């Protein structure tokens, strides 16, 4: 859409003193500020309620085409629009039937005229134009809702007739507590039959077993099996990892039962030990590392020769290696010229169907 710049000498005939301006259509124009070097500005009035001459709307949108290069004020001579000669304010305050504009401007006129814009927001960048836009919140009120960027973690909600109120996107839920174990943190909250909150563990336990989850953890299974009044009939011990029975049915400890099973004789009492000796069927990596850390400087065993890390012979340094060009003959396939493989011609579908083979 093209807009022509209106100078101060050509008054607009559409705006008369009769007050017949339309209130339904939006008026848009491009006006200059009186000088050749002055930037042009595009202004659009949301609703024109002109009774006399041209009057500014309560909501006036100003879109500067580029920032002023000078720091001095911009003189304007808009006598045709009912404006006296002077410094033009980019945010004029206009009185209307709806009341004065109480929302503060996004940028003050003094800082806009005297200060220079940052390089990232020059030449009508989208960020700058989006910041200058103002929209009416409601036709019944005069509050303006500035369209400025907000923080992604804070949501600002504007109410009609009131200011914005900040709400956090991550609001904390009500404090919940498991009625069984008293836990306050769980990946999933459940409910019992009466509607009370249960943590995920207590809820699953009650669902599977039909009873409340016990608060005291059960003790681990005892490694040493103890029976009241039970003794080995051979060594008379009452502590063992496994109780067995001999041929006559008498209880025996694990050691005596295994010894009799392997040798068919009773285990001698001289082999009895106070402690229970166990063996590790699989040596864990932790025990290996522990042994290596205990003896890091253990000398090698006598009579055991470690294999050489160089299987092709001792290591030779630079200058000690003899010339070996006359000893090694190049492989035979390196001397032959490379062969060029010719692929068979492709047979098309029509030739295969007709039975004609290519030459």
UniProtKB/Swiss-Prot annotation:
Signal peptide feature range: none
Record's subcellular location: Nucleus
User: Which GO biological process annotations does it have?
Assistant: cell fate commitment; erythrocyte differentiation; negative regulation of transcription by RNA polymerase II; positive regulation of transcription by RNA polymerase II
The answer to whether UniProt assigns keyword Lipoprotein to this entry is no
Q: Which UniProt keywords are present, listed alphabetically?
A: Activator, DNA-binding, Metal-binding, Nucleus, Repeat, Transcription, Transcription regulation, Zinc, Zinc-finger
Q: Where are the zinc fingers (GATA-type)?
A: 178-202, 232-256
- Molecular-function GO term, any one: RNA polymerase II cis-regulatory region sequence-specific DNA binding
Q: In which tissues is it expressed?
A: Expressed in the developing ventral blood island, and in both tadpole and adult erythrocytes.
Q: Which InterPro entries match?
A: Transcription_factor_GATA, Znf_GATA, Znf_NHR/GATA
One GO cellular component term of this record is: nucleus
Task: Please tell me whether the keyword Metal-binding is annotated for this protein.
Answer: yes
- According to the record, the residues making up region (Disordered) are 1-21, 271-311, 323-359
Compositionally biased residues, Basic residues: 279-291
Q: Main site of residence?
A: nucleus
Q: What does this protein do?
A: Transcription factor that acts synergistically with tal1/scl and lmo2 to specify embryonic dorsal mesoderm to a hematopoietic fate.
Name of this chain's protein: GATA-binding factor 1-A
Organism field: Xenopus laevis
